[in-house]
C-alpha cells in the first residue's frame, strides 16, 4: 500500500492510502515511521503504525486529562474509553503512565486525605467512599487512613457547627445536631462525641427561654394552619420536645401561650 496524501489537521495528520483507506496519526507517528507521500507500506508495517498511532494519540489524551489535576488509574482508563481507545491500548498507556509516575493511586489517596486535613471537613468513612468512587482500591486507602489522626479536624468541624447553631438551639438539640452532622460527614460516633468535650454548651435560663419563645412562635405559625385546640397543643409540644426543650418548660409556655 502506498501513501497518497498526508494532510495536517490541527493536532493530528490525515493519512490516505491508495486502497482508499485512511487514518489519523500523531506527529510522533510521522517521525517514528518516517512517513511521507508515496511511501509504500506492507501489512505488518501498517498494523504497527496503526497500533503506535493509537497508543501515541491515547497517551496524549491522557496527559491532557492529567494536566488539570491528579487522576486515578480508573479515571484515566474511563476517559480513554470515552475517546474510543481500544482496551489493549489503554492497558499499555496505563502501564507507561505508571512507570513514568504520571499516575499513582497510593499518592493520589495520600494527597486527597492530606488536603482534606488542611481544608476539608470529611471524616475517614466519607473519604474512603470518595476514593473508592475514583476507582482506588481499599488496600491503597486503608493504611493511609489508619495513620491519619482525625481528632483535630473533628474538633474544628464541631466548633464551626457550634458557632453556627448555638444561638438557634438549646444545649441538647445542639449536641444532637453536631453529632449527627459529624456522623454524616464520615466521622465515627466516638470521635463525634469526643469532639463535643471542648465546647461550652452552658446557656443561662434566659437564653433558653428566648430560644423557646422564638421556636414556639415559629411552630405556631406553621401548625395553626392545620390544627386547633387540643390537637394543636399536642403538636406544638411534640415539635418543641423534638427540638430538645425541657418538658416542664414547654408545658409552662403552652399554658400561657394558648
UniProtKB/Swiss-Prot annotation:
Keywords: Cytoplasm. InterPro entries: RecX_HTH_1st, RecX_HTH_2nd, RecX_HTH_3rd, Regulatory_RecX, WH-like_DNA-bd_sf. Pfam families: RecX_HTH1, RecX_HTH2, RecX_HTH3. One of its GO terms (biological process) is regulation of DNA repair. GO terms for cellular component: cytoplasm. It is found in: Cytoplasm. Its main location: cytoplasm. Belongs to the RecX family. Modulates RecA activity. This is Regulatory protein RecX. The gene is recX.
Amino acid at each position: 500500500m502506498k501513501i497518497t496524501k498526508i494532510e495536517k489537521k490541527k493536532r493530528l495528520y490525515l493519512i490516505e492510502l491508495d486502497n482508499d483507506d485512511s487514518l489519523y496519526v500523531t506527529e510522533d507517528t510521522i517521525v517514528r515511521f518516517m512517513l511521507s507521500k508515496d511511501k509504500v507500506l506492507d501489512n505488518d508495517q501498517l498494523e504497527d503504525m496503526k497500533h503506535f498511532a493509537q497508543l501515541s494519540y491515547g497517551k496524549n489524551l491522557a496527559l491532557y486529562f492529567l494536566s488539570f489535576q491528579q487522576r486515578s488509574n480508573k479515571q484515566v482508563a474511563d476517559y480513554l474509553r470515552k475517546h474510543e481507545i481500544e482496551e489493549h491500548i489503554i492497558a499499555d498507556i496505563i502501564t507507561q503512565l505508571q512507570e513514568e509516575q504520571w499516575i499513582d493511586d497510593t499518592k493520589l489517596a495520600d494527597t486527597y486525605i492530606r488536603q482534606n486535613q488542611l481544608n476539608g471537613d470529611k471524616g475517614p468513612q466519607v473519604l474512603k467512599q470518595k476514593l473508592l468512587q475514583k476507582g482506588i482500591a481499599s488496600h491503597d486507602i486503608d493504611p493511609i487512613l489508619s495513620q491519619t489522626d482525625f481528632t483535630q479536624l473533628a474538633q474544628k468541624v464541631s466548633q464551626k457547627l457550634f458557632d453556627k447553631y448555638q444561638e438557634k438551639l438549646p444545649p441538647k438539640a445542639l449536641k444532637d445536631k453536631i453529632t449527627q452532622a459529624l456522623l454524616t460527614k464520615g466521622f465515627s460516633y466516638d470521635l463525634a462525641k469526643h469532639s463535643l468535650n471542648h465546647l461550652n454548651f452552658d446557656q443561662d435560663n434566659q437564653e433558653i427561654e428566648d430560644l423557646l419563645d422564638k421556636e414556639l412562635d415559629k411552630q405556631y405559625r406553621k401548625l395553626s394552619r392545620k390544627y386547633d385546640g387540643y390537637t394543636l397543643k399536642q403538636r406544638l409540644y411534640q415539635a418543641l420536645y423534638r427540638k430538645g426543650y425541657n418538658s416542664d418548660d414547654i408545658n409552662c409556655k403552652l399554658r400561657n401561650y394558648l
